[in-house]
């Protein structure tokens, strides 16, 4: 995304990232100016469990304005929002971007926004367990 914005985007285009609190190595790396690693991979957003590397850290450091951290509950609620309103099944890692939007509404108010939503790479059993565990009602099916 950062490279595409830099190459194709306007100079006024801002890139804002999102990460789960449990795997916030990019957030901490930007704050500390050096690559940090995660001590845990306990997140529903399994596509974001990997650690930041030496190749992508400079790209992120130089191309991103900020990273917003979100909770597991915010990720699950974002997935549900997209499922119910758009009828699209998105994976938890993609829901992080939606969670950032809903968490920081004022930051994006009256702005043109692009969000990349991706696939249904989702462990349904794990998601249903988390929905029950966190007392978040499961999405309603329409009959």
Residue positions per predicted region:
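PLP-dependent amino-acid enzyme catalytic core
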Residues: 1-143
